[in-house]
């Protein structure tokens, strides 16, 4: 056993890798069944959880790298960047209770996922975090962009739903080298609500919508604002009863974020579907399961684990661990006290 680098009741490095691989995609109980199916032996669910969270915590800590704004030229001139939040189920145990099942608080926390890639690339770089606030998400977005090829002479084309925190972080992280475009589909949702109040029938509504889409895509935002202005509701009506006024106010307050003509001319995306999909297959697929509630530090660690795999850093992690780890393993990779909680 010593020559195999395994101690009694321990897990070898290759076995740990298999455990983490299975548990990265499915609940720990199902990972146990997968191990039994493929390797023919039983491992306790608590061991699977401990090994997985230990390595996930290591990956989370490894992702905390300070980053300076690049001074060298970038590998690519145009970088596409997106970030957005999605809710994750979180449980906070009551430290005063001996039985941790009692007194716990359930809530939903926002997991912010970021991605960036060179224009035309189909292999984004991802990042994600729950704790740390919007500043952490912004730094992660910058990190994704730098890894994707952003440099001192690059420009970032950010696309999103117009949330103020995203716009603010694009400005804070990229300054004049960054630009922000509101997702075209998101704008069309405002236009569609207005069209229902303006157009008398389905055919007229469709024609009106197509005219406004064409105006926006060809750089004629003022035409759309004028078309809306002719149908503004009385000021005494509440916003929920005034879709035309709501749409007009939304567009007129974001003129600098609606330059679809320029984006299309530069062959850049006008939609943020990439980040919406990323939330589903990075965060929600593992962290948003029926009946599953996570301690926030464990959710952050599992998010880091899934990001490590999708970014192609999986092999490098295990290779580095093999070089730095001690010969004997005792089911528990070294991890911080916080991530072990």
Where are these regions (language model features)?
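Catalytic center-proximal scaffold of phosphoryl-transfer enzymes
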Residues: 1-341
């Amino acid at each position: 056993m010593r020559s195999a680098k395994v101690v009694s009741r321990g897990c070898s490095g290759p076995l740990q890798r298999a455990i983490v691989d299975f548990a990265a995609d499915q609940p720990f109980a199902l990972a146990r069944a997968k191990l039994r199916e493929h390797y023919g032996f039983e491992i306790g669910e608590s061991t699977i959880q401990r090994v997985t969270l230990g390595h996930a915590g290591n990956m989370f800590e490894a992702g905390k790298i300070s980053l300076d704004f690049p001074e060298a030229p970038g590998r690519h001139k145009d970088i596409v960047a997106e970030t957005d939040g999605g809710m994750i189920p979180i449980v906070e145990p009551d430290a005063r209770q001996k039985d941790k099942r009692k007194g716990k608080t359930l809530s939903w926390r926002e997991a912010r996922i970021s991605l960036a890639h060179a224009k035309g690339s189909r292999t984004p770089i991802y990042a994600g975090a729950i704790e740390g606030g919007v500043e952490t998400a912004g730094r992660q977005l910058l990190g994704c962009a730098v890894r994707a090829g952003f440099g001192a002479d690059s420009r970032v084309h950010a696309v999103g739903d117009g949330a103020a925190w995203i716009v603010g972080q694009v400005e804070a992280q990229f300054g004049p080298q960054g630009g922000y475009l509101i997702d075209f589909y998101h704008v069309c949702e405002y236009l569609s609500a207005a069209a229902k109040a303006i157009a008398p029938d389905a055919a007229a509504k469709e024609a009106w919508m197509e005219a406004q889409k064409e105006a926006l895509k060809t750089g004629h935002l003022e035409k759309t604002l004028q078309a809306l202005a002719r149908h503004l509701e009385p000021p005494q009506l509440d916003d929920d009863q005034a879709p035309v006024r709501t749409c007009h106010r939304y567009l007129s307050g974001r003129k600098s974020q609606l330059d679809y003509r320029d984006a299309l001319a530069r062959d850049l995306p006008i939609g943020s579907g990439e980040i919406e999909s990323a939330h589903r297959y990075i965060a929600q697929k593992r962290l948003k399961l029926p009946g599953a509630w996570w301690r926030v530090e464990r959710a952050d660690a599992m998010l880091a684990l899934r990001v490590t795999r999708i970014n192609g850093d999986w092999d490098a992690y295990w290779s580095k661990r093999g070089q730095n780890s001690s010969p004997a393993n005792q089911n528990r990779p070294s991890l911080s006290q916080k991530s072990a909680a």
